[in-house]
Amino acid sequence: MATIADSRDIILAPVISEKSYGLLDDNVYTFVVHPDSNKTQIKIAIEKIFSVKVASVNTSNRKGKCKRTRTGFGRRKNTKRAIVTLAPGSKSIDLFGTPA
């Protein structure tokens, strides 16, 4: 396994869906992460980037869907998601930014 140098290379993007949006009230956040990262690296990266205390990290590997194209079949890439639960009393993460 290769080491990942920067925390921002581990956390790729937040997942914005109905399910993940509903979990924001419980201080549970979902992120797309680098496929080679482990739970410890994800926890350290979240704590470093957002200055919060992480209680737990759950990960899931998602297979890419097969999609039909004009020339045959293609495939979306496989992704890894991390569901991060913040510790009680920790400040929340502002994913959407403040309104202008």
Curated annotation (Swiss-Prot):
The keyword Methyltransferase does not apply. It comes from the Bacteria. Keywords: Ribonucleoprotein, Ribosomal protein, RNA-binding, rRNA-binding. GO terms for cellular component: ribonucleoprotein complex; ribosome. InterPro entries: Nucleotide-bd_a/b_plait_sf, Ribosomal_uL23-like, Ribosomal_uL23/eL15/eS24_sf, Ribosomal_uL23_CS. The keyword Ribonucleoprotein applies. SUPFAM superfamilies: Ribosomal proteins S24e, L23 and L15e. One of its GO terms (molecular function) is rRNA binding. HAMAP family: Ribosomal_uL23_B (MF_01369_B). NCBIfam families: PRK05738.2-4, PRK05738.2-5. This is Large ribosomal subunit protein uL23. It comes from Mycobacterium leprae (strain TN). The lineage of its organism: Bacteria, Bacillati, Actinomycetota, Actinomycetes, Mycobacteriales.
